[in-house]
């Protein structure tokens, strides 16, 4: 391996470095200087000059192997701000929730009604092995300043197997700046569901990515320590499996902004068993904002999901 120094546009000042094998493909649009042979400067100022297809083909083949070994079904959610109030029985972020006649909103540890941040009408989903085929899954969090992350009692996931007559007195939760109340959902959003395929990337976890181990086993002479090393090649195709995953989804992998909080619990803890991603809710423009453009995630143990037991779901939200 050889250390190359990144030069500025003048070719005179060193502004960075990269470790690469001799003769490696390195990022276009830059000038690089061999550390041990300063006279050897690699001019890569012309975009599209590098034959990077070999790297992409190798990585793509390994990704397909990972898909075959451990596919993670994913349903992508595309929100859009509703032009008018949506029916209470449809999938949505925010707005008036579906509540059966005679049923009130769940309350938090202080006895205050929680707010519904998302509800998924299962009949509107593409065929999938994650959600029940019928009914409604709702996500509720406390309206306190922590948005329910402070206590187990302050967030709920509720499943209604069948939809019947709705409670006409159900109300939406909106923020009120006059009383200094902030809420992640600024406006009701309609949801569109698509199935882009499978996920194996782990946003913000490039060091533990399964592709990392598989790449180093297959190509030890080109070993990398993190998927961030692929950034050297500046290839858009690489983003298909090292991307940040900045979108809302059902299934797939959660998107933790500050690392996976489940790691803070012992290996044998029940929290570690909650591995199925029920919902990742990503910030969306100025309409959905989890803190400073963050995300929220809900995860459940596979056996509880199979039993339609949503009483113990791991919930977290964090921002960048």
Task: List each language-model region with its residue ranges.
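Preference for intrinsically disordered or flexible, low-complexity segments
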Residues: 6, 41-320
């Amino acid at each position: 391996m050889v250390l190359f120094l990144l030069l500025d546009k003048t070719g005179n000042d060193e502004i960075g470095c990269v470790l690469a094998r001799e003769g490696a493909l390195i990022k276009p649009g830059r000038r690089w200087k061999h550390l041990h042979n300063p006279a050897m400067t690699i001019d890569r100022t012309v975009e599209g000059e590098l034959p990077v297809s070999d790297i992409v083909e190798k990585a793509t083949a390994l990704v397909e192997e990972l898909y075959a070994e451990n596919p993670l079904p994913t349903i992508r959610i595309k929100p859009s701000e509703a032009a008018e109030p949506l029916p209470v029985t449809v999938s949505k972020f925010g707005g008036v929730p579906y509540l059966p006649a005679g049923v009130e909103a769940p309350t938090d540890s202080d006895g205050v009604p929680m707010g519904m941040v998302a509800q998924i009408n299962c009949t509107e989903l593409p065929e999938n092995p994650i959600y029940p085929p019928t009914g409604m899954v709702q996500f509720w969090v406390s309206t306190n300043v922590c948005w329910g992350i402070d206590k187990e009692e302050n967030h709920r996931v509720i499943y209604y197997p069948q939809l019947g007559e709705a409670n006409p007195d159900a109300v939406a939760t909106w923020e009120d700046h006059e009383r200094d109340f902030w809420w992640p959902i600024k406006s009701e959003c309609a949801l569109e569901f698509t199935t882009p395929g499978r996920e194996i990337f782990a946003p913000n976890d490039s060091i533990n990515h399964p592709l990392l181990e598989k790449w180093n086993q297959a190509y030890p002479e080109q070993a990398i320590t993190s998927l961030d090393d692929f950034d050297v090649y500046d290839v858009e195709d690489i983003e298909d499996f090292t991307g940040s995953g900045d979108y809302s989804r059902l299934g797939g992998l959660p998107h933790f902004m500050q690392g996976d909080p489940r790691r803070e619990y012992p290996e044998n803890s029940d929290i570690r068993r909650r591995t199925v991603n029920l919902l990742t809710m990503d910030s969306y423009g100025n309409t959905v904002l989890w803190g400073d453009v963050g995300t929220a995630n809900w995860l459940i143990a596979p056996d509880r999901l199979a039993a339609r037991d949503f009483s113990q779901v791991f919930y977290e939200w964090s921002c960048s």
